[in-house]
Amino acid sequence: MRIALIDGEHYPDVNRWALEKLNVECAVFIGGMEKIGSIEDVERALNVKLYHDKDPFKALEKALEENDVEEVIDLSDEPVMTPELRFRIASYLLKRGIAYKGADFEFRPKEWIKLEVPSINIIGTGKRVGKTAIGGFVGRTLKERYRIVIVTMGRGGPEKPEIIRGDKITITPEFLVKIAEQGRHAASDHFEDALTAGVPTIGCRRCGGGLAGFTFLDVVKEGIEVAKTLKPELIVLEGSGASFANVLSDGFITVVSALQGERIKTYMYPLRISLADIVVVTMVEEVSEGEKIKRIIKEINPDADVHLTRFAPRLIGNVEGKAIVLTTSQESAKKMAKELERKGIEIAGYSGNLANRGRLREEMNRFNYDTVIVELKAGAVDVAIREALSNGKKVVFLDNEPVNVDGKNLKSAIKKLAERILHDKGG
């Protein structure tokens, strides 16, 4: 059935006229009192059940609990129904698989997939928020107790799901160059997770991403079927950019960058946050700044376990001689270079241009180095690693390890989430 959202900026008889035209059986009062005497006047005029509360979301929640709702029609308008409120309502409804339609807009949810195998869905609020680093960290943490498979999706992912046995093979620079020479994206997330987590990974392709984070096309469902053949105790799904797999998992981890600030309460970022059991705020330089973002997150999702973190360099391999550091942003390259210097590594230079292949080549040619320390991102393989190996240089991979700055323990929280999921699933 359909229900409608109405307000007190419309006269009650106008609301009744619209509800009759649209054959709507009940309504939720959003607010506004200019053209009504009282809420009781509206109830008497409508001839349908009216849900109302000081908090319109509580009224909407009750309406959804008591009715089998497939679509919500928005008959409200400014100033009661602001664009920000509409996006909050859209986020609220799409999370529940309910369509939301207004005069000139329509949001329809992608069908949620439910799995028999226990699963955790890792989603991000944008690109470069550290989602893959968190995915690798989750894999490393949980493989201590469970058989884990990570299913990734990406804009450079394979057309058919591809298995990388990170638990059985060593991901070397030479191996990745051979992959790139075959015309494949060797810096895709399933290669990175196999490298950093040491677990089996399944790479999938996706194209397009909507406001809510659903993809236009992907092969994740097929990837999950491939993952099942490995008999995992737990499947970890990892999103791509601001998009994520439409799997209604048993647990959600949402990754937010501190650099996003108040933006996370706009548009449909609240949907991603409202799904979360754990929210990881990355790139927190000042705890006070992180606390501001934490308050925003708690307003959206009071039950979320929020962790304020920064990234510390974790090297996969041993550095020899002078090293250069290559990442996807100048700021992160500078920070990582400084931290590595404090650990006694001689840094000859750094670059944040992994995503700009032309500039990356120019900068590498200017440096005098023995070892390349590189994130497995963007042009890492087809430019940085290929260039280093052709010149007889050593390659060491750089992973970003989340470190709590708030006194909490993210690793412990992830273990507890997995324990709860396996317990609830009877595992």
Swiss-Prot record:
BP-aspect Gene Ontology terms: gluconeogenesis
CC terms in the record's Gene Ontology section: cytoplasm
Protein localization: Cytoplasm
The keyword ATP-binding belongs to this UniProt entry's keyword annotation: yes
Record GO terms (molecular function): ATP binding; cyclic 2,3-diphosphoglycerate synthetase activity; ligase activity
Catalytic activity: (2R)-2,3-bisphosphoglycerate + ATP + H(+) = cyclic (2R)-2,3-bisphosphoglycerate + ADP + phosphate
Record has Endoplasmic reticulum as a keyword: no
Main location class: cytoplasm
Assigned keywords, A-Z: ATP-binding, Cytoplasm, Ligase, Nucleotide-binding
Enzyme Commission no: 6.5.1.9
Organism domain of life: Archaea
UniProt family annotation: Belongs to the cyclic 2,3-diphosphoglycerate synthetase family.
Protein's job: Catalyzes the formation of cyclic 2,3-diphosphoglycerate (cDPG) by formation of an intramolecular phosphoanhydride bond at the expense of ATP.
Protein name: Cyclic 2,3-diphosphoglycerate synthetase
Lineage, opening ranks: Archaea, Methanobacteriati, Methanobacteriota, Thermococci, Thermococcales
